[in-house]
Structures are given as C-alpha cells and as structure tokens.
Amino acid sequence: NKLKLKNKFLVCGNRKERQDSVHKKISSRIANKIRKFVLNDDCNDTACALKVFDRKDYTKIEYFKNMHRYLPALFKMNNCKIYNVMVDDRMRTYGYSKYTFNNRFWIGIIDLVKVWILTKKGEKNG
C-alpha cells in the first residue's frame, strides 16, 4: 500500500504480532488506551519506534524530555493528519531495554498531564 501524503502529516507504526512478554503487552495496551482516551491522538501504538514526518512540522513542536510518547498528540495539535501503518515487530538483537514499569509510570503520568494541558491551550488558541 502506498500512502498519498499531503502536507502536515505524521505516520506512526503499529506493531503486529508483538514479540514482547505478556506483562509488557498488557501494560502497553492499557497505557495506549489511557493516552488515546485523554489525548484523542489517533495513534494505536505510540511505543512503536516508527514515526515519519516532515522536519518543518517537527520543529514547530515545543521540545521536552520523553516527548516521543506524545508525538501524535503534539502533531495533531498542530493540525497534522495522523496515519497508522502496520509494521513487523522484531526481537532486540543486541543489548536490553532499560525501561521498566517503575521508571516509566510516574514520568508518563506527569507528561500525559503536561501534554493534555498543551492540547487544551491549543484548542483555545486555535
């Protein structure tokens, strides 16, 4: 399939047949549902690393640490169309993930609130 992309877009990968543990799959599914409910960001799998966008749209977004989780909401706030494409998931070849539930949960909640406030400000100004 070929996407016909117009200006102002973000393409997000959506991992099919994830190669993660049951615990990771469940926690990711819950986090995605909460994020999607709060931000209405049109992205099914924000933890998937595949993100394709135009640099000029990206540079309009205010940078903050861990913003990669919220790129769909931030792009949508700037009137970009969000597309989801299915991608194959692969096991990590080298190294290991340093992320755990404990070191992501509270930071994720705080950032979710920050982005929610940003999107509400954007609605008032836009």
Describe each model-derived feature in a short phrase.
Residues 87-89:
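Hydrophobic pocket-lining residues within nucleotide cofactor-binding pockets
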Residues 1-66, 91-110, 115-117, 121-123:
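Acceptor/aglycone-binding surface of glycosyltransferases and processive sugar-polymer synthases
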Residues 56-61, 66-85:
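A short, conserved alpha-helix in the catalytic core of glycosyltransferases
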